[in-house]
Amino acid sequence: MASDMPLVQLPQRGERINVPLVQSRSEDQRLVTSARQTDKIDADDLVALANQLNSARQLVKGRACDRLKQIADQMEQLHMAARAVLEDAQRDEHLHNVPCNMEKQPGRIYHLYQKQGSMNKYFSMLAPNEWGYQEKKEEYLGSYRLEYDRSWTPVGEMDRKDEEVARLQQLLQREGPVALRGNPNF
């Protein structure tokens, strides 16, 4: 099989080859420094190199410290969030153990009372102003809504909770589950 391309001939051992190089520039425009120039060691160059290394170390340390501080701040926020979750769980457990002579239904508001002169607490559907007795206002401890996940929300926090749920519902409606988008790949 013949080819129109010329064959490359490799030089024989010990044979010198002339290779064209890029035309040299003047001394002040050199791209490559000659070996004679690189062999020279100047004290100022060593000081500059040491300063550059020290500066790089300081930057690396500073960046690492900043990142560690950010992680520590996140850990503190997670710690506070975990503490709030545990406190809410403890409150919810306590409220679930309060006697109630009716079936507790999610979405309803229950009013917590403590009998005067007693440690006994109980839930009622009646708010303090609906009783008609002054004593009930004195026994009143607070009002809570039973959520569908069986957690309790104090009445004072209901608006915030409702806004949070509405935002999550909007997000779910807008984004939707990934599995429901388009055609499934079965």
From Swiss-Prot:
This protein's name: Uncharacterized protein C08B11.9
Highest taxon of source: Eukaryota
PANTHER family given in the database record: SIMILAR TO CHROMOSOME 1 OPEN READING FRAME 50, UNCHARACTERIZED PROTEIN C1ORF50
Alphabetized InterPro entries for the sequence: DUF2452
Pfam families in alphabetical order: DUF2452
